[in-house]
């Protein structure tokens, strides 16, 4: 009898480890937080940005479509790890000097809070065993955004509007990435 209970516990333990991404936070909170972050970002819009500056930034710092393509083909844990890194990089970027940005500071703080909670929630889903080293290309991409757009344009309101648009694209892409896991479960 004791052996049978041990085998049942072992089986349940192994099965649970195999489906470690069955995470309550991801299943119940991710979509809400994702929607909140996108809504907050939309309230931060500044319509005074010149479209010629948009074209200039696109040539300087191209959106990393290839990285998202690779991530979409990765394991579930690697998808979440990639998403957590993107959210962490967004938080670092928005922590820079934003005194010239057109949005209210409270909105920006709320946005940072939601993005940080998203990253922490997803981090709890992948557990400590899956914290691989960061994707250097993702890190370098965000560093280029900081240098070429923010610093290059003097942290102006226009530079922050370009960053806001770029980050919205990232948030939509990571939402798609994580949503693919939600529909798969």
Kindly label every feature range from the protein language model.
Residues 34, 76-79, 131, 138, ...:
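Intrinsic-disorder-associated interaction segments
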Residues 67-130, 135, 142:
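Extended, amphipathic alpha-helical segments that serve as helical scaffolds
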Residues 135-185:
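Eukaryote-biased recognition of C-terminal alpha-helical segments
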Residues 1-3, 179:
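Eukaryotic intrinsically disordered, low-complexity regions
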Residues 19, 38, 42, 49, ...:
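Eukaryotic basic, amphipathic alpha-helical target segments in cytosolic regions
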Residues 23-88:
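Mature extracytoplasmic or organellar-lumen-exposed domains after removal of signal/transit peptides
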Residues 2, 11-29:
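N-terminal signal peptide
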């Amino acid at each position: 009898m004791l052996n049978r209970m041990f085998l049942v516990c072992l089986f349940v333990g192994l099965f649970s480890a195999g489906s470690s991404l069955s995470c309550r936070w991801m299943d119940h909170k991710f979509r809400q937080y994702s929607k909140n972050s996108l809504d907050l970002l939309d309230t931060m819009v500044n319509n005074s940005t010149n479209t010629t500056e948009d074209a200039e930034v696109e040539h300087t710092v191209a959106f990393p479509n290839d990285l998202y393509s690779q991530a979409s083909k990765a394991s579930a844990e690697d998808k979440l790890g990639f998403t957590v890194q993107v959210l962490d990089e967004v938080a670092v970027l928005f922590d820079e000097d934003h005194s010239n940005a057109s949005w209210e500071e409270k909105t920006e703080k709320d946005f940072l809070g939601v993005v940080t909670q998203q990253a922490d929630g997803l981090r709890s889903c992948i557990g400590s065993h899956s914290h691989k080293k960061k994707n250097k290309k993702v890190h370098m991409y965000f560093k280029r955004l900081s240098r070429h757009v923010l610093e290059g344009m003097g942290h102006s309101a226009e530079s922050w509007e370009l960053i806001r648009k770029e980050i919205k694209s990232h948030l939509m892409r990571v939402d798609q990435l994580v949503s693919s896991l939600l529909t798969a479960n």
